[in-house]
């Protein structure tokens, strides 16, 4: 069940969900929220052609504020993306070309759009790009109007920068050092243009956010606020949002809806109820009831399926969720008749291990090439023991050669050894 957060105690509700790492002048912010709707913003730098799971918590926070009646501004950093944020980064970022960054800006703007409502009256969301105010600014204006308000002493003492300065092998370029000024000016600019009074971001952005608060006060004599969401960690200490294949992306072309769904299904019991608070709009009482039910049911917990459904629907829509569940069910029961060509394309993208083979190959060779078996001899024994299926149908003849009828949609054959070991053959 989705809920609309009451604006008057919104900060408290976010804290109950574990979504507040730090907040400036919490009492004054709570008072301001109680007075009526505000405008707030969160920035997304185009450092890749897609957002990833690390962006999801602040993005959903924007949505939570909008549901409570506030006006969200999604800022895509067309200018800051050309510079690179040094915050807590061990080394200098590679600079991307203007054309590349512009292409990524367009993709990220489209990605952000479905999460917010851009047509709901007074609190309709706004999409902004900081290249609009930095693109035409000359260096003298930057140094005189922005630079003069920043103390280098304070800047080098910010934790995010200090870590780089203290390393013998990695310093920091003036380019990245100036990033703090750019993000600070974003806040001041959005305050003037749209009346923005709150910036939200990840906990690594605290130094940049407080710089923006100070600059807005100096330039416009306005009180503004900052709130950071926590860095998501897993109970076992490993990094959240990563798989063996790398980051989990929001773009379905980079991480398929099936793979995305499976990522959440595989959430550890120690993390799942916390993640339901972070990544869904379920009421806290409902999450607690689910935890109690799982604890007492004596069966496998239901929470992972609820989490996977909720987040996959949020990111990939009903169609993406239905496809992910259909593929999951088909792989589990071995019946592939319900799978569409698009479903096989998801599997080929990142769903199961995939190999390419020339037509006319035999089953033993396919098992070896796919690394489902180490040798033809072992493959022969496995096939004879009835442990291999082709598209869900058992095949016990070690001398079997693939037939045209084994090739689905003119391209695909799904092999399985045992219950869980899959490989998708893509025929050349």
Curated annotation (Swiss-Prot):
Keyword Ligase among UniProt keywords: yes
One GO CC annotation: cytosol
Entry's EC annotation: 6.1.1.1
GO BP terms, alphabetized: tyrosyl-tRNA aminoacylation
Coiled coil (UniProt feature): none
Annotated binding of ATP, by residue: 242
GO MF terms, alphabetically ordered: ATP binding; RNA binding; tyrosine-tRNA ligase activity
Keyword ATP-binding among record annotations: yes
Main location class: cytoplasm
Sequence motif 'HIGH' region, residues: 46-55
Amino acids binding L-tyrosine: 41, 179, 183
HAMAP family reported for this sequence: Tyr_tRNA_synth_type1 (MF_02006)
Job description of the protein: Catalyzes the attachment of tyrosine to tRNA(Tyr) in a two-step reaction: tyrosine is first activated by ATP to form Tyr-AMP and then transferred to the acceptor end of tRNA(Tyr).
Self-association and partners: Homodimer.
PANTHER family tied to this protein: TYROSINE--TRNA LIGASE, MITOCHONDRIAL, TYROSYL-TRNA SYNTHETASE
Family: Belongs to the class-I aminoacyl-tRNA synthetase family. TyrS type 1 subfamily.
Annotated protein name in UniProt: Tyrosine--tRNA ligase
Gene: tyrS
């Amino acid at each position: 069940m989705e809920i609309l957060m009451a604006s008057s105690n919104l900060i408290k509700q976010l804290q109950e969900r574990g979504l507040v790492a730090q907040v400036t002048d919490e009492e004054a912010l709570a008072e301001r929220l109680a007075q009526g709707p505000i405008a707030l913003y969160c920035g997304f730098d185009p450092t890749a052609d897609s957002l990833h799971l690390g962006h999801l918590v602040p993005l959903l926070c924007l949505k939570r504020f909008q549901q409570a009646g506030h006006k969200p501004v999604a800022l895509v950093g067309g200018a800051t993306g050309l510079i690179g944020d040094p915050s807590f980064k061990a080394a200098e970022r590679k600079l991307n070309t203007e054309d590349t960054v512009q292409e990524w800006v367009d993709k990220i703007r489209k990605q952000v759009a479905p999460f917010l409502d851009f047509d709901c009256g007074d609190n309709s969301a706004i999409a902004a790009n900081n290249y609009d105010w930095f693109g035409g600014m000359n260096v003298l204006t930057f140094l005189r109007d922005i630079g003069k308000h920043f103390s280098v002493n304070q800047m080098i003492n910010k934790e995010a920068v200090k870590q780089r300065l203290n390393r013998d092998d990695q310093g920091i370029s003036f380019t990245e050092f100036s990033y703090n000024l750019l993000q600070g000016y974003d806040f001041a600019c959005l305050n003037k243009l749209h009346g923005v009074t709150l910036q939200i971001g990840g906990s690594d952005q605290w130094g940049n956010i407080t710089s923006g608060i100070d600059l807005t006060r100096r330039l416009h004599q306005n009180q503004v606020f900052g709130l950071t969401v926590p860095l998501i960690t897993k109970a076992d200490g490993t990094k959240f949002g990563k798989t063996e294949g790398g980051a989990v992306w929001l773009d379905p072309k980079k991480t398929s809806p099936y793979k995305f769904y499976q990522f959440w299904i595989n959430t550890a019991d120690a993390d799942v109820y916390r993640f339901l608070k972070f990544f869904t709009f379920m009421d806290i009482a409902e999450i607690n009831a689910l935890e109690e039910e799982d604890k007492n049911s004596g069966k496998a917990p239901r929470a992972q399926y609820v989490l996977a459904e909720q987040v996959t629907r949020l990111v990939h829509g009903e169609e993406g969720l239905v496809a992910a569940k259909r593929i999951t069910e088909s792989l589990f029961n071995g019946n592939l008749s319900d799978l569409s060509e698009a479903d096989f394309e998801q599997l080929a993208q990142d769903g199961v291990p995939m190999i390419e083979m020339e037509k006319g190959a035999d089953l033993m060779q396919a098992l070896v090439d796919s690394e489902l078996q180490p040798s033809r001899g072992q493959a022969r024994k496995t096939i004879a023991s009835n442990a291999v299926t082709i598209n869900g149908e058992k095949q016990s003849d070690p001398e079997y050669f693939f037939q045209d009828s084994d090739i689905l949609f003119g391209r695909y054959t799904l092999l399985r050894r045992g219950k869980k070991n899959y490989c998708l053959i893509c025929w050349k």
